């Protein structure tokens, strides 16, 4: 099965990594709109337009399924993309909510949603969680993480300063953290360590990773089996510097 994976930049690598590990597909076309990253600071109309242009990119490739590996595009443009497409298009929000339902049974569990300004402003996660009966949901726009990750700043004082800026004011410890941007799993261990150290925790918070969630979702929805395609063909495309994107993929995905 030939599929496409679309993200605003390198954040979709976290989803791609989970897909490669699961070995669900034999061919993957990855498109990163790196010339216009980040999406999270842009308005809804612009995000929809960029997402439709990404959809146009995939048409000559004759893919059978498209994964929108961008929370901002999933929150604001998924329905628009689906209306303009004859193939199935899957976002990352619904799979993450299903993962919450599977792993978090107590509806009063404190849940923190991290995301870009656009994703948080859309209330997509908040509304979906409330529809499932979760009552203790808070959110935090952490958009500054995106440019840091795009520049491969995955550790060090700059990242620590950024985490302190966002997390130090928190008064309630979240038992569950939704990484509501596909860039964020690339610093998941740092986020987990911050909460363990600064909240003096014996048990780290449960991090919901959209990459792992979407693998479970695809298996259930399309009856896909793991470990079928050990060496899928992967093509990388970008609106910006594709050589840079390929270099980042080799480093982060160990290709």
Curated annotation (Swiss-Prot):
Pfam families: Asp_Glu_race. GO terms for molecular function: glutamate racemase activity. Gene3D superfamilies: 3.40.50.1860. Disulfide bonds: none annotated. Substrate binds at residues 7-8, 39-40, 71-72, 182-183. It is an enzyme of class 5 (isomerase). GO terms for biological process: cell wall organization; peptidoglycan biosynthetic process; regulation of cell shape. Its EC number is 5.1.1.3. The active site is at residues 70, 181. InterPro entries: Asp/Glu/hydantoin_racemase, Asp/Glu_race, Asp/Glu_racemase_AS_1, Asp/Glu_racemase_AS_2, Glu_race. It catalyses: L-glutamate = D-glutamate. Keywords: Cell shape, Cell wall biogenesis/degradation, Isomerase, Peptidoglycan synthesis. SUPFAM superfamilies: Aspartate/glutamate racemase (SSF53681). Pathway: Cell wall biogenesis; peptidoglycan biosynthesis. Provides the (R)-glutamate required for cell wall biosynthesis. Belongs to the aspartate/glutamate racemases family. This is Glutamate racemase. The gene is murI.
């Amino acid at each position: 099965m030939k599929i496409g994976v679309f993200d605003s930049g390198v954040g979709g690598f976290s989803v791609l990594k989970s897909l490669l590990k699961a070995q669900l597909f034999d061919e993957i076309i990855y498109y990163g709109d790196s010339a216009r990253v980040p999406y999270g600071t842009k308005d809804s109309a612009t995000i929809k337009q960029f997402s439709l242009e990404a959809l146009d990119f995939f048409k000559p490739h004759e893919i059978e399924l498209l994964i929108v590996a961008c929370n901002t595009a999933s929150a604001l443009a998924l329905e628009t993309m689906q209306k303009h497409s004859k193939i199935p298009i899957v976002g990352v929000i619904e799979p993450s909510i299903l993962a919450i339902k599977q792993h978090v049974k107590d509806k009063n569990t404190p849940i923190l949603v991290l995301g870009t300004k656009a994703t948080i402003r859309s209330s997509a996660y908040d509304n979906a969680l409330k529809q499932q009966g979760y009552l203790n949901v808070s959110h935090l726009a952490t958009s500054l993480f995106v440019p840091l990750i795009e520049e491969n700043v995955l550790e060090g004082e700059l990242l620590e300063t950024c985490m302190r800026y966002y997390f130090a004011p928190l008064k309630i410890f979240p038992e569950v953290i939704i990484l509501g941007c596909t860039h964020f799993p690339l610093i998941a261990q740092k986020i987990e360590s911050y909460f363990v150290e600064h909240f003096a925790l014996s048990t780290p918070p449960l991090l919901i990773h959209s990459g792992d969630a979407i693998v479970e979702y695809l298996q259930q929805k399309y009856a896909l089996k793991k470990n079928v395609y050990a060496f899928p063909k992967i093509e990388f495309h970008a609106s910006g510097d594709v050589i840079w994107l390929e270099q980042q993929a080799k480093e982060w995905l160990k290709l």
